[in-house]
Amino acid sequence: MTIPQSPTTEDIVAALRNADAVQYGEFELSHGGTSAYYIDKYLFETDPKCLQIIASAFADRINETTLAGVALGAVPLVAVTSTVAGQPYVVVRKKAKKYGTGNRIEGRLNEDEEVVVLEDIATTGTSAVEAVNALRDVGATVERVFVVVDRQEGAREQLESNNVEMEALVTATDLLVDDENV
C-alpha cells in the first residue's frame, strides 16, 4: 500500500479495513452500550501504513497549532502526526498521577496557546470533552477536535455544546456503507 500525499476518505477507509480494524459481532463499548461492529484502534494504531495515512490526513488539516492526544489511545496518533506536521504536542492524562511531576498535561504548553485535540474514535464525545476541559483549565485555547472515526452516536453534538468543532476523517457511515455485516 502506497501512502497517498493527501489521503481521501476512501484511502482512510481502505487503510482501516486493510489493518483489519473493523470487526463484527456483539461488542460492549466504553460507554456501556453494545454494538454490532467494533473499530479496534489498537490494530490501526499499530499498523505503520495505516498510521502514516491517518497522520498525513490530520497534518493536512492542521495549521501552526500545538497538538494534544488523549492518553493512552491517541498517543500514537498525536506522536506520528506531530512528526509529519512538524508541530509540537502534549499528552492529556485522564487524571493527574500522584508521582513524578503530578501533571495532567504532559509536555510544554503555554497559556493562551491554540491546541487541537486528536482522538481515535468518537462515540459519545465524553473523553474528548474531558481533554478539552483539562487543556482549557491550564489556559489553552481549544476550539477543534479531530477524530479518526466518528461513530455518529452523539460526540459531535456534545462537543458543539462545549463550543468545540469536531472534524472526523471518516464516519461510521463512510466505513460501513458497503458492508452487509451490520
Curated annotation (Swiss-Prot):
Catalytic activity: orotidine 5'-phosphate + diphosphate = orotate + 5-phospho-alpha-D-ribose 1-diphosphate
CDD domains noted in UniProt: PRTases_typeI
Keyword ATP-binding: no
Pathway(s) the chain acts in: Pyrimidine metabolism; UMP biosynthesis via de novo pathway; UMP from orotate: step 1/2
Presence of keyword Transcription: no
SUPFAM superfamilies named in the record: PRTase-like
Binding locations of orotate: T123, R151
Example GO molecular function: magnesium ion binding
Amino-acid positions noted as binding 5-phospho-alpha-D-ribose 1-diphosphate in the UniProt annotation, renumbered to this chain: R93, K94, K97, E119, D120, I121, A122, T123, T124, G125, T126, S127
InterPro entries: OPRT, Or_phspho_trans_dom, PRibTrfase_dom, PRTase-like
HAMAP family in alphabetical order: PyrE
Family: Belongs to the purine/pyrimidine phosphoribosyltransferase family. PyrE subfamily.
Name listed for the protein in its UniProt record: Orotate phosphoribosyltransferase
